[in-house]
Amino acid sequence: MFASRPAVHPVEAPPPPDPAEQPRGVLMKDLPGMPGTAGGLGLRLAQFAFAAVALAVMASTNDFPSVTSFCFLVAAAILQCLWSFSLAIVDIYALLVKRCLRNRRAVCLFAIGDGITAALTFSAACASSGITVLIDNDLDLCSENHCASFESATAMAFLSWFALSPSFLLNFWSMASG
């Protein structure tokens, strides 16, 4: 057997420094777009605005409930509005009291929530764009439907997803590297 048996030699530790001089711990990098920053608040407000416009435009038509993908877009836009608005309020609070929101649990919660809402918003926008192309180009039924409203709502849903993607990627990267 060639197992090694290391000997442990005690090393005298230096005296602890003054508690006032100790670093407060390792903080994650303060990147624009992270929770609790002005960039993060801007992204949340853009997500909310685009999702609210998509919801308002789609709800203004009277025939959206007849197509399942449009109902899915409305449901995803409602969820996106609620999520983005609540996190925008949290960001405003963090900015006002100068509080750091980048602890591990908060970033994990933000990343998971952003991932779920991003997947729902993107899939709803893709499904709605497929139906819109079917109605407009393939069936030529735009004279009977609200194609411009459907296209506008779908475009706003994609813009909401584009505003959500940096938030998700920054939170996920921060969660994975922390």
Swiss-Prot record:
Topology, Extracellular side: 59-69, 127-152
Residue numbers spanned by region Disordered: 1-25
Membrane spanning stretches: 38-58, 70-90, 106-126, 153-173
InterPro entries xrefs: CASP_dom, CASPL-5
Predominant subcellular localization, coarse grouping: membrane
Keyword terms, alphabetized: Cell membrane, Membrane, Transmembrane, Transmembrane helix
GO cellular component: membrane; plasma membrane
Family per record: Belongs to the Casparian strip membrane proteins (CASP) family.
Identification of the protein by name: CASP-like protein 5A1
Classification lineage: Eukaryota, Viridiplantae, Streptophyta, Embryophyta, Tracheophyta
